[in-house]
Amino acid sequence: MTALRLGSLFDGIGVFPLAAVRCGIEPVWASEIEKAPISITKRHFPDMAHLGDVTKLDGRDLPPVHIITFGSPCQNLSQIGNRKGLAGEKSSLFFQAIRIIREMREATNGLFPAIAVWENVPYALQHINDVMNRNQLCIAPP
């Protein structure tokens, strides 16, 4: 049986890869731009590729993974933030993850990723349903 493989966008300190390893999932690559979190992740996952800025990645060029996780910036989605939602400068980076997922799916004829997991603040849910439906990213029973 082939092990599931994971890619992590907006990786931070590597919480998704850490959880993945504990479930028998192999973290393959991560994208993060902050040096301190990258150093932490490199210490725990020395073999995981660090790919840098999500805005410079192309999903067609990334090693295909079964699962893509992402915790895009929440500043514009948080109740204590400016509440510009996904139109805000930082929180709109969410769409970079969607772009990368779509590119990988196109390059693999829809095989990868099979699962996308987004982590964010509770207030984000008020902004996301219409976006997910418009982008045909979530097809689930009501």
Task: Briefly describe each language-model feature range.
Residues 1-142:
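Conserved active-site and SAM-binding loop architecture
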